[in-house]
């Protein structure tokens, strides 16, 4: 970064405090979910450190892999393992939540279908062909990877993300259903 030295020292101090506070939170907090979020703060602070060192790709990989995958995996595994709390209104609150989720997901699905149907794919293909002229201008590998992911491999990339989302929702649903069948009647 081309900033004055005093500003760089201030930014590094803030990043170091984020790493220190996040690490202390991981160790000292009793709730495992709060510890997981503290771990996320630590990972984000480390990625900011990489940004200061002009390692943009490493910073992006840090955020995507550690914060986006590992930290989310920890939070979901904790949510799946914890026993549900005793609640008398569990069935009504669950039905209300299911209905709200159904409405939101159905409206999102219909919105996406309408966008897909209204998109003129032939124009997108012609734009893609016209951008081939500018391909030699790209200098770094990060720019080439980003260009390929957003042009040639856009549809497989998005389909893979939807597939992972469906697998995650299915795993959560299966875990909740198996937990409901395994609990004795006095705990429900």
UniProtKB/Swiss-Prot annotation:
This is NAD(P)H-quinone oxidoreductase subunit 6, chloroplastic. Belongs to the complex I subunit 6 family. Its EC number is 7.1.1.-. The keyword Ribonucleoprotein does not apply. It is found in: Plastid, Chloroplast thylakoid membrane. NDH shuttles electrons from NAD(P)H:plastoquinone, via FMN and iron-sulfur (Fe-S) centers, to quinones in the photosynthetic chain and possibly in a chloroplast respiratory chain. The immediate electron acceptor for the enzyme in this species is believed to be plastoquinone. Couples the redox reaction to proton translocation, and thus conserves the redox energy in a proton gradient. The chain crosses the membrane at residues 10-30, 32-52, 61-81, 97-117, 153-173. One of its GO terms (molecular function) is NADH dehydrogenase (ubiquinone) activity. It is a multi-pass membrane protein. It is an enzyme of class 7 (translocase). Keywords: Chloroplast, Membrane, NAD, NADP, Plastid, Plastoquinone, Quinone, Thylakoid, Translocase, Transmembrane, Transmembrane helix, Transport. It catalyses: a plastoquinone + NADH + (n+1) H(+)(in) = a plastoquinol + NAD(+) + n H(+)(out); a plastoquinone + NADPH + (n+1) H(+)(in) = a plastoquinol + NADP(+) + n H(+)(out). InterPro entries: NAD(P)H-Q_Oxidoreduct_6 (IPR050290), NADH_UbQ/plastoQ_OxRdtase_su6 (IPR001457), Nuo/plastoQ_OxRdtase_6_NuoJ (IPR042106). The gene is ndhG. GO terms for cellular component: chloroplast thylakoid membrane. NDH is composed of at least 16 different subunits, 5 of which are encoded in the nucleus. It comes from Psilotum nudum (Whisk fern).
């Amino acid at each position: 970064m081309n900033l004055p030295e005093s500003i760089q020292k201030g930014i590094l101090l803030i990043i170091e405090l984020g790493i220190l506070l996040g690490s202390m939170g991981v160790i000292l907090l009793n709730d495992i979910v709060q510890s997981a979020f503290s771990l996320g703060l630590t990972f984000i602070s480390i990625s900011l450190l990489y940004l200061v060192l002009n390692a943009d790709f490493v910073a992006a990989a840090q955020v995507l892999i550690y914060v986006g995958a590992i930290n989310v995996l920890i939070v979901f595994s904790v949510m799946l393992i914890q026993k549900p709390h005793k609640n008398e209104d569990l069935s009504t609150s669950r039905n209300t939540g299911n209905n709200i989720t159904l409405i939101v997901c159905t409206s999102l699905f219909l919105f996406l279908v309408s966008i897909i149907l209204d998109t003129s794919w032939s124009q997108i293909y012609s734009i893609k062909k016209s951008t081939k002229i500018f391909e030699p201008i790209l200098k770094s590998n990060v720019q080439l990877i980003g260009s390929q992911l957003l042009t040639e491999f856009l549809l497989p990339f998005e389909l893979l993300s939807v597939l992972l989302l469906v697998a995650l929702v299915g795993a959560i649903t299966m875990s909740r259903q198996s937990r409901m069948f395994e609990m004795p009647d006095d705990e429900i």
